[in-house]
Design a protein with these regions (language model features):
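Accessory alpha/beta interaction modules
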Residues: 1-167, 177-179, 236
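Short, charged alpha-helical interaction segments and adjacent helix-coil junctions
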Residues: 1-6, 13, 69-86, 90-95, ...
Length: 243
């Protein structure tokens, strides 16, 4: 049985528990996003929703469960229609296993996040920007790159601006060609969240959060229930011949 103390941030249970913490969850997500995007996120409000379930449009359609959905609301960019700051949504998805059909998975996550948070009757110019970010221990495309950034564009005119506000990022923890040393170090720590992999102040802060989360008795109790549930699901899958 895996112990909570041995879990890494690439394990979605630990990632979710750090992100949902009311004291430091927003700061945790801010550090991750700033490192990935290479820019500061400041003078903004950050709301974090963890393990958010979004049902399909009908009972027969496919729903998803988001690991950590972060809303960056910037009061400097006011939306005329709502009178509030313009929002950008970031869906953070750590996965310690090989995901199937990453391109189409990313497409579906984008569609669901957008439709869930775009208000009825709003003009399309108010459609929010959305980032779906997968953090993976397995290379999704087999090109051995640390970062794959996916944007839509025009085939005939690849240099033509086509800003639809939709970006999907796949991060491979062991990949090459890192856009920054900070990102490389952070992904190494996310995959193996040990003190020896702390190499800068931001990672030290993340490590402090991880340590506090693992010491939380409430998290420990939730982990035991989560482990029992996962074990039951695997047992049922074996019995049904699905695993």
């Amino acid at each position: 049985m895996q112990k909570l103390e041995d879990m890494n941030l690439i394990d979605n249970f630990l990632f979710q528990e750090v992100a949902r913490n009311k004291e430091y969850g927003g700061e945790f997500c801010r550090i991750i996003l700033e490192t990935i995007l290479g820019r500061e996120i400041k003078e903004v409000e950050i709301d974090v929703e963890v393990e958010k379930s979004i049902p399909g449009a009908t009972l027969e359609s496919h729903g998803i469960r988001l690991d950590a959905l972060v809303k960056e609301r910037d009061p400097r960019r006011m939306e005329v229609s709502t009178g509030s700051g313009a929002a950008t949504y970031f869906d953070l998805e750590p996965n310690n296993y090989k995901i199937s059909d990453p391109a189409r998975r990313g497409r579906y996550y984008q569609a669901v996040v957008t439709s869930e948070h775009f208000g009825k009757g709003l003009d399309y110019k108010y459609l929010m920007d959305t980032y779906v970010i997968f953090i993976l221990s397995d290379d999704p495309f087999g090109e051995d790159r640390m970062m794959y950034t996916i944007r839509n564009g025009c085939v005939e005119l690849p240099d033509m601006p086509y800003e639809d506000g939709q970006i999907t990022i796949f991060l491979y923890t062991k990949g090459k060609y890192a856009p920054s040393q900070e990102l490389s170090d952070m992904l190494k720590y996310i995959e193996n969240s040990r003190e020896e992999n702390v190499s800068n102040p931001s990672l030290q802060r993340m490590s402090d959060m991880v340590r506090e989360t693992k010491r939380d008795r409430t998290v420990g109790a939730k982990f035991m229930m989560w482990w029992d549930y996962e074990a039951d699901m695997k047992r049922h899958a074996r019995e049904e011949g699905l695993e």
